[in-house]
């Protein structure tokens, strides 16, 4: 879908493109985005996906505080929560679901 809609040397504004994409498709999207960036395209993306946030060299801006700030990938809540969940699934779910 993305490959057919995007063209070289354009500016793309995307709001949560991961919403309907599996993790595998998000990786495919990263490859398409990379190829287009190499052709001169630029992307401004609002996302919660740690996969899309991982794009090398991306400027990640956080709107969580009073001021907009650039943050490192590993400092994002999306990365930290996903990493913690994947590394500690059982204890995470036990704490979350404990009544």
Identify the residue ranges that each predicted region occupies.
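GG-anchored amphipathic helix commonly corresponding to the ABC/SMC/Rad50 NBD signature/C-loop
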Residues: 1-14, 24-31, 35-36
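Short loop immediately C-terminal to the Walker-B catalytic DE motif
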Residues: 18-19
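C-terminal lobe/lid and adjacent interdomain/linker elements of RecA-like ASCE P-loop ATPase modules
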Residues: 24-44, 49-99
């Amino acid at each position: 879908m993305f490959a057919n809609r995007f063209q070289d040397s354009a500016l793309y504004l995307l709001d949560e493109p991961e919403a309907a994409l599996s993790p595998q498709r998000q990786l495919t999207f990263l490859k398409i985005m990379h190829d287009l960036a190499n052709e001169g395209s630029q992307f401004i993306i609002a996302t919660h996906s740690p996969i899309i946030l991982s794009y090398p060299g991306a400027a990640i801006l956080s709107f969580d505080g009073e001021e907009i700030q650039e943050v490192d990938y590993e400092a994002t809540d999306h990365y930290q929560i996903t990493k913690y969940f994947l590394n500690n699934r059982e204890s995470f779910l036990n704490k979350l679901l404990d009544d």
